Amino acid sequence: MRYSQYFIPTVKETPSDAEVISHQLMLRGGMIRKLAAGVYNYLPLGLRSIRKVENIVREEMNRAGAIELLMPTVQPAELWQESGRWEQYGKELLRFRDRKDTEFCLGPTHEEVITDLVRREVKSYRQLPINLYQIQGKFRDEIRPRFGLMRGREFIMKDAYSFDVDEKAADISYDKMYQAYRRIFERCGLKFRAVEADTGSIGGSWSHEFMVLAESGEDAIVSCTACDYAANVEKAEARQSAVTEHADPRDMEKVSTPEKKSIEEVAAFLAIHESSLVKTLVLLADNEPVVALLRGDHELNEIKLKNILGCDTLEMAGEEVVVKVTGAPTGFAGPVGLKAKIIADLAVQGMKNFVTGANAKDLHLKNVNLGRDFNVTTFADIRNVVLGDPCPRCESGTLEMWRGIEVGHVFKLGTKYSKAMKATYLDADGKEQIIFMGCYGIGIGRTVAACIEQNHDENGIIFPLPIAPFHCIISALNMKEDVVREASEAIYGQLAAAGIEVLLDDRDERPGFKFKDADLIGIPMRIVVGSKNLADGKVELKCRRSGEVELLSIADAVEKVKAAVNAALK
């Protein structure tokens, strides 16, 4: 490919609305252009990397025994109503009506469609197991699309769905996909962790997220210093201490805390540690008030609480509801005397003589004790873990924190969709059985963006060779010189004939301009062809990642590029 005939609209300035480095560099490198909020054009250079990831995904899916198909983006509402997700999914589901007033949605995922297809076609255990996948555009009406391809509204995704006769067989399918995902991200050249995760709106009994490690990541993940335990913060647990304070209960008393609303303010005012307070949070679960209690230095994990309550919606209550439930403004709530359901974190269970709000403005209670002063409906793990918490899986490790970008997610769905939608088969005895399912997603564009977050420097992108738009760029310093043009064309022809994806920069531009563009778009290897070095029979070969520069003969440079590509793609 010749640069002068290609479409790579690079820009030197960083766009003001691009917050993260991948968004900045993909815009500057002429890889994407914004059409609307969270909706992008994939330009030729960006599309080449997208296709590279798709091909790796397709190869590994096929290797794992999955079969490719393609489903419609437009989905009928009746399928979502049948599964129970039409209302549950919320405003991210873009709904519309056609001219006949029939309701549809733009698919953010395809569990309903694939389950409907399989229940129509699969009748016998002899047709199972089967794993079907597609690579297709999706749409989720994100409330705040941001970060370019990292959190868009329209995006490219690989989604696969496995169907099995029972849970044991479904576990085998799950493990096949888990291992396939590891191979995919290894082949893409990414540093990643597979972590335990909440199943969210997809549902099911178990899931893992594949997280690319990056400081810019939106997700917090934890891992153990001593074993292989890892989870995202929504799912992460800490080993619960059996320690109970043995102090004798003291008389409860009211103390004045004028305008001291926050945990930090109250702790400082009373000269106590934040862990000696219990915070009282009022929430609405499916619009019904519920109270959560946590140790003062801990934070509520709304996902854990939502799962415990089994509600569809959970949100912090507004001031009006807080006053109605507690009789006091926000900041002075406490559990004593409340009639609402109270869910307390496990860390509260062993506390004695703690401080809470008094359910009256500018007042708190000291020496509050469980059982004597109030009762709890349920004790459960409802907090976020913190750095240094003991690992829940081993005796010696503690938890450390990382930032990550979710690029893949695998789910054990069990019978969530097949039971709701009556997807069944006849077993060997002719009895009707419910199909067990799994689903498995990879964000294709997000994988490219995450790769850039992990692979860049001050000059631009440093693509891993397997997903780089081109393997090598030839920077011809002056194509008007016969010797430079002939040598550049010869190198280009030899590399192309060997199957190397090569971009010949034949533009009439200054050398420095060409070098900056080559660094910006992140092509792994650069051959510089100039008359000065050609006089000695040499060209310059530079590695984008290491910055190493070598003067080599044309033959040696070509062989070195071929060897590097073959090694990376084998």
Swiss-Prot record:
Biological processes per GO annotation: prolyl-tRNA aminoacylation
Subcellular location: Cytoplasm
Catalytic activity: tRNA(Pro) + L-proline + ATP = L-prolyl-tRNA(Pro) + AMP + diphosphate
Enzyme class: ligase
Main location: cytoplasm
Family indicated by similarity: Belongs to the class-II aminoacyl-tRNA synthetase family. ProS type 1 subfamily.
PANTHER family from the UniProt entry: MITOCHONDRIAL RIBOSOME PROTEIN L39/PROLYL-TRNA LIGASE FAMILY MEMBER, PROLINE--TRNA LIGASE
UniProt-recorded name of the protein: Proline--tRNA ligase
Provenance organism: Geotalea daltonii (strain DSM 22248 / JCM 15807 / FRC-32) (Geobacter daltonii)
Lineage: Bacteria, Pseudomonadati, Thermodesulfobacteriota, Desulfuromonadia, Geobacterales
